[in-house]
């Protein structure tokens, strides 16, 4: 693909130049080619976007629930009509295989938008009787202007996961995509406008997180910030949001999730789940189950099943329908993953497979890392303690149920967890003791629109998806009505 035209900001229903004068480049990580130069939003641009959003939000919130629902449903239809076009752009920008982006990224994002479009008319208050002459009623009102700050691994899906409930509740959103993968969020803004969303209700500000993101989190005109990213960045966002105007926050942060295989499990099923929990999207999924606990007596058999499945991984041309493994999202990220792999070897973990970059025709110019499996791992190893966010699996062994529960919970993270077992009683007994917000039994990775997702401990605050997320984009107003004569003590 030839280099795209310079990308601008999207404010008040159309493209506009950044006043900052700064730009950055977005790269195709499969081959290292520059996709586009992108303008970076500065402080004045954030001010413009907030004013635009404030104007648009008043118009949007004044519409009936059915009017808002119809507009969002039109956006869903356009997303599905343009699935292939958007998936191709997402593949170019992220490096993910087209077989993945065309069946997951836009599809699941559109599903979430459709889900919230359907919930809009059901967003209701309540009536509370006090006595014969008095009652209270409540209203769920929009927060106003909210900000979404996205991560680079699922650009358009995250933009939809954040904007769908926010818009459904009557808010306007200013969205800052990751500077690594900014392109499809701009296309989403076009689609919202085409569907009939009032100008200003969804503005997109590409830019560097330390600048554009900070301006958003500090801005007094922003009522809430929804952030997806790393723990360290999330803490800064939260601190800025509280210090500036006591904003509400939703934080979807990192994970180092355990996948526990029990001795009664079907090892073929367990190996299939472990592969998806580590190598789907080249390991760049926040919920990945990278700490794979297996009974000591099952270790050798499990390792052989993993090795057989690694042989089935098809890396290569990301637009080949048979390819199911792409490069990492950027060269700096590739180098960081390679540092972790080197650290694992240095600390004594044994490389079962991988452990280096992929080499040869089609790989040498891209950010490719081979699917890597470590075994003989210990809980104190860096690769077991820290989030790598790449195609790196760590296999650990255990002896008893109590032991593995304790070790699985021995982490600052608490995003996800999963178990594989044929024992229904054990499944629920163990899951109820795991300190994680998203749990799977005999499966991994699915996050449907109806399912609230979010983390315990350092993995986040609040939830995305589900009914409770729609409610989190509202504020409750309580009104008491007195029908009898008011009695004063004065």
From Swiss-Prot:
Cofactor(s) essential for the protein: K(+)
Residues binding K(+) 2: 246, 457, 460
Keyword DNA-binding attributed: no
InterPro entries tied to this protein: Ald_DH/histidinol_DH (IPR016161), Ald_DH_C (IPR016163), Ald_DH_CS_CYS (IPR016160), Ald_DH_CS_GLU (IPR029510), Ald_DH_N (IPR016162), Aldehyde_DH_dom (IPR015590), BADH (IPR011264)
GO biological process, one term: glycine betaine biosynthetic process from choline
PROSITE patterns in alphabetical order: ALDEHYDE_DEHYDR_CYS, ALDEHYDE_DEHYDR_GLU
Name this polypeptide is given: Betaine aldehyde dehydrogenase
